[in-house]
Amino acid sequence: PVFYGGNSKGENLFSNSLLAIDALSGKRIWHYQFVHHDLWDRDLPAPPNLITINVSGEIIEAVAQVTKSGHIFVFDRADGVPIFPIEEKHFPASKLIGEEAWPTQPLPTKIPPISRQEFTREMISDSFAGTKSMISWGPSGKANEQSIIEKFDELTSAGQFVPPDEKGVIVFPGFDGGAEWGGAAFDPNNGVMYVNANEMPWVLKAKKLDFDSSNPVINYGAGIYQQHCASCHGINRAGRSNFPDLKNINRNYGHQSLQKVITKGRGVMMGFPNLNKTELKSLSAYLLSDYSINIPQKELKETSRKALPYAVNIAGRFLNEDGYPAVAPPWGTLNAIDLNKGEILWKVPLGEYEELTAKGYPKTGTENYGGPLISAGNLIFIGATNDGYFRAFNKKTGEELWKYKLPAGGYATPITYKKNGEQYIVIACGGGKMGTPSGNKYVAFSLN
């Protein structure tokens, strides 16, 4: 994600958009952009659902899209006309030099969001208010000396679509939703959508870059790093979550091999073929701490004029010192939405921290990655939670009926199939998210 858009002014079509394309001709039929000039990593996390609904007696072939901000948009499939009202609402301007945040963003006005939309001071968890705060990608980071309340007061928290600033902006719901990659399930028999959601606050912070240095090559390379690499590998190259530490990368790479990885990518890392030779050489010099690299001053100045004035990066989740979210629960939910009427039917916590439940806390829900599956027997099956359970819910009431401890987190959407007259459900147990152990198994269940 790019959190500074001073060099890409405008709405930035067709990013963050749903496109209807004629599959035979490739012609665009209609489109809808959900976020203009995205500064918050609000890409669409999941595929849309093709649905048939009954709105005031009219049968409509529609398409529904869930979003990271926790909203559900529904359109007529043929022409892209919204089924329920959408309003372009005004949001604050950016305080960063050169940034021109788009003045409005579209929000549904009928279907309620599936995640809370603003983290206020009153929503700080009573149980953790006096504990130390932690801004970290995972639950095992280093706590600050400030309490959660003190840290909250230091940050900007004003709801959706507040542009990044140098103080730090709370993005809530966070960069992983709202809805996430598992997407939603839709029941054609009753017009109800079932979707899980996250309610985790994250912090987004801008840092002004200074390109005046006794070693302009290294300094310029540091600027390139902050713009393109720090959101994953950390501002100080120390790594985070599943992204490696780069501070000693010179033990394993030279300039040629490192530049090849930067350009072409490796594993989950995308490549950066857009970097020119000067940018690539400077970045390589910075990462390898090679102060001997020389670039002609004229060439460096010409390139540096294109450099962005800020590095805007994800600082991490806003947690307490024990790794629990700073906001009061629920931290993850499962939701049923009647898309015939645009109404939420029920909402229940999804997942739990067993150590908190044992102390008498109500189920808090957890962050979740992976979607639901509906059966014909009025059941919803879902893994997704960081407690590692696979669960079944009553689709009419949201009551949790059953759970099974998986060998690793089921951060995937289950599938179902039939063999020899018997129905099975399978979920991939890859784990690895949210600081949980990785796994390599598929687990299958028989529906008897």
Q: Where are the model-predicted features located?
A:
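Beta-propeller blade signature
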Residues: 11-26, 72, 76-80, 332-338, ...
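Extracytoplasmic electron-transfer domains, predominantly the class I c-type cytochrome c fold
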Residues: 216-219, 226-231, 236-297, 304, ...
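A structural motif specific to WD40 beta-propellers
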Residues: 29-30, 83, 345-346, 399-402
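Repeat-solenoid scaffold signature
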Residues: 37-123, 176-181, 185, 274-282, ...
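Blade-level signature of beta-propeller repeat domains, shared across WD40, Kelch, NHL, RCC1
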Residues: 189-196, 200-207, 415-448
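Conserved beta-propeller blade signature
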Residues: 62-65, 192-194, 345, 380-382, ...
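Electrostatic cytochrome c docking/interface patches
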Residues: 206-224
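Extracytoplasmic beta-rich repeat domains
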Residues: 1-2, 8-15, 31-51, 90-108, ...
